[in-house]
Amino acid sequence: MAKVLALSFGRKMSNTDVMLKEVLKKCEEAGHEIKFMRPDDLEIKPCIGCCGCVVGIMSGRTNGACVFKDDFHLVEDAYYDADAVIIGSPVYETSPSGTFKTFCDRFGPSHDLAFLTEAKKRAYRSGQ
């Protein structure tokens, strides 16, 4: 049984919500554990490009946590707990929703597996 997470970046009760819930219903019928989240319902601040997450990882001082203490960790924890993630976003003016862009910015390099692997190698070589 897999854990399936659906992240909806559309308006509440929008077509995006409806489509994701329909997919989740099929997943549940197939015996999978499901979770639906709307990041718009949470307090998630936009990335300010301070690179605190990256510097923390590279220096070995932190695990790459964002300097903001908001609800992003709820989405992050659900994302890492899931075996499959389905993301839905409407397209506004040829771009995804602003909340989805914020999610991508906040999930940036501090969550990139290649970057994290390289940072661990550097820390190991430097004796940290």
Predicted regions and their residues:
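N-terminal beta1-alpha1-beta2 submodule of the flavodoxin-like/Rossmannoid cofactor-binding fold
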Residues: M1-L116
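Short, conserved loop/helix-junction motifs that constitute active-site signature segments
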Residues: L116-Q128
